[in-house]
Amino acid sequence: MAESVRVAVRCRPFNQREKDLNTTLCVGMTPNVGQVNLNAPDGAAKDFTFDGAYFMDSTGEQIYNDIVFPLVENVIEGYNGTVFAYGQTGSGKTFSMQGIETIPAQRGVIPRAFDHIFTATATTENVKFLVHCSYLEIYNEEVRDLLGADNKQKLEIKEQPDRGVYVAGLSMHVCHDVPACKELMTRGFNNRHVGATLMNKDSSRSHSIFTVYVEGMTETGSIRMGKLNLVDLAGSERQSKTGATGDRLKEATKINLSLSALGNVISALVDGKSKHIPYRDSKLTRLLQDSLGGNTKTIMIACVSPSSDNYDETLSTLRYANRAKNIKNKPTINEDPKDALLREYQEEIARLKSMVQPGAVGVGAPAQDAFSIEEERKKLREEFEEAMNDLRGEYEREQTSKAELQKDLESLRADYERANANLDNLNPEEAAKKIQQLQDQFIGGEEAGNTQLKQKRMKQLKEAETKTQKLAAALNVHKDDPLLQVYSTTQEKLDAVTSQLEKEVKKSKGYEREIEDLHGEFELDRLDYLDTIRKQDQQLKLLMQIMDKIQPIIKKDTNYSNVDRIKKEAVWNEDESRWILPEMSMSRTILPLANNGYMQEPARQENTLLRSNFDDKLRERLAKSDSENLANSYFKPVKQINVINKYKSDQKLSTSKSLFPSKTPTFDGLVNGVVYTDALYERAQSAKRPPRLASLNPK
């Protein structure tokens, strides 16, 4: 069933800068009907209606309970959910998402979501939960892991038909309680890019997405996985107001481009006529693809400034928010997903139990997943024999020395014997300890008997539902047709109809002003686009002129001497938004074959001058080829060691990609609670299992 994106608007108080400028109030709100009134400097008013309107005196607790609480409940049930704050720089987006921890009423959406999730898991009976989190930022159109070992490493966005869009190499950390989540949030927030501008001393210079995965397994073994995206967007900026220069200006340019792409996606989704939705125009829209028109319940918190100095920015924010509420999503429960981390734990526990108790299986695990030590040894032996035959075949095809072959076979045999020894070293006590370590990662049911917590949770849910119903009822009252009402006198009916007519006239004038404003905005956008095109044209001409100067001095023996050919061979990569150019190569001096013996004299040329020129050029090339050491290398047969080294490098590359992936979820990773996305998502696509018993290495 399709449902619309829910939109709430929050207005912050005046800041010190606005007070110093003596700006006036331009925003008014009617919270009981979700109405926002924006007063233009010329006195004209514009009205917008949303799912919630929160003025200066509103609290983070009020916003969460009214709007976000039902969404988080749905995430625990297995839905995908997204909450993102949208607005200009300094409008209170980060404050709405993070809040102030020391003031209970002003805690933000993210810490409240942590409390909510762990309270819900603790009071739910007969379900085991696994909660893990990830934290990334998009800085200058580069995706980075804020919780990774190297938070400056650029990550790649990938897409799979059944999985959707994900970030390869993103670390996911298992959390058992609220303090663990807060520690991750604080660590990632400290790694995030922030900077000072004239409008905000702690301005976010990147978009950030904190994702909480909630996986639940019932006693029957079925798994549901919900995902909550908590998005804090960087704000749109005007250089004239922020005073940005240098790196700050470059950051602002990237921020504005990504927010512009987000606005284009929203407009295309609402338009209904667009056949193409431009999700790939930026990294932000690519990652939010499922949240806008996909399988996700989405909430937008539009943050605005009350100051008349920011009227244009506030109007733009309200317009985009008004469009966003017309986006239709189709959320469904994620049942038994292939990439569930809980399934990895489930299979590992079942595997350990079957090692010490043949025939035993884990909770909810299918019986066919259990296997005995003998079966494991048999599979190890089959893998060893297959690898040995492949290795021998490769060496025979390359006709390399037996010594090298024997050396590599011994290394392979040593790996096989080591894996067998690990099986023998696994005793019941050690296996039981490992099983307990894995089971300790699960949470759920700790407060199953706490009636007070359960009642509080149900009360909050009912209050949120009641608030939504009251808002809908209030809006329906305002939509009633006065002609359908029953009046006691004709004068009363005349007054009602006159009042309705005045409202319609006012609304009509508002639409006329809206059309004029839109024409003005379109004209400004057109001028902005023309200016951008003009600058890009200047940049392109500069690069072309530099290329014309450089091309004559490029060596003729390189493939890049032919620019037209390079252009034809270049391929555009849509995912990375860049050109994939051919590798640079240089042609070596080529002599005739050494064993050709007698070479026929070339046909006589009528023009001896041409032949003389050719001979001169050949002598010149031979003179320049001394550095290539042709005399020592040309007639020398290819060494066998070169073939061996090439085979080893190829074998190492293929092995690292297939048999020994670098980020396969091992026992240590599962116990430490740090797993990488590509270890789950790419494994779900591949039929090949990770290295056998890699998690059973004795410590």
From Swiss-Prot:
Deleted gene: phenotype: Worms are defective in osmotic avoidance, chemotaxis and dauer formation.
Give the InterPro entries listed for this entry: Kinesin-like_fam, Kinesin_motor_CS, Kinesin_motor_dom, Kinesin_motor_dom_sf, P-loop_NTPase
GO biological process, alphabetically ordered: anterograde dendritic transport of neurotransmitter receptor complex; cell projection organization; cilium assembly; dauer entry; intraciliary anterograde transport; intraciliary transport; negative regulation of non-motile cilium assembly; non-motile cilium assembly
| The entry's keywords | ATP-binding, Cell projection, Coiled coil, Cytoplasm, Cytoskeleton, Microtubule, Motor protein, Nucleotide-binding
- Which residues constitute the signal peptide according to the record? none
Alphabetically, the GO molecular function entries are:
ATP binding; ATP hydrolysis activity; microtubule binding; microtubule motor activity; plus-end-directed microtubule motor activity
Which superkingdom is the protein from?
Eukaryota
GO cellular component term, pick one: dendrite cytoplasm
Q: Where is the Kinesin motor domain?
A: 4-327
Q: Where is this site: Required for autoinhibition?
A: 444
- Where do the coiled-coil regions begin and end? 339-523
Concerning Pfam families, the annotation shows: Kinesin
SMART domains on file:
KISc (SM00129)
Please list the residues that bind ATP: 87-94
Role according to the record: Kinesin motor protein which is required for the anterograde intraflagellar transport (IFT) along the middle segment of the sensory neuron cilia together with the kinesin II motor complex (composed of klp-11, klp-20 and kap-1) and on its own, is required for IFT along the distal segment. In addition, regulates the length of cilia. May have a role during neurogenesis and axonal transport.
Q: Which PANTHER family match?
A: CHROMOSOME-ASSOCIATED KINESIN KIF4A-RELATED (PTHR47969), KINESIN-LIKE PROTEIN (PTHR47969:SF21)
Question: What name is this protein filed under?
Answer: Osmotic avoidance abnormal protein 3
UniProt lists the gene as osm-3
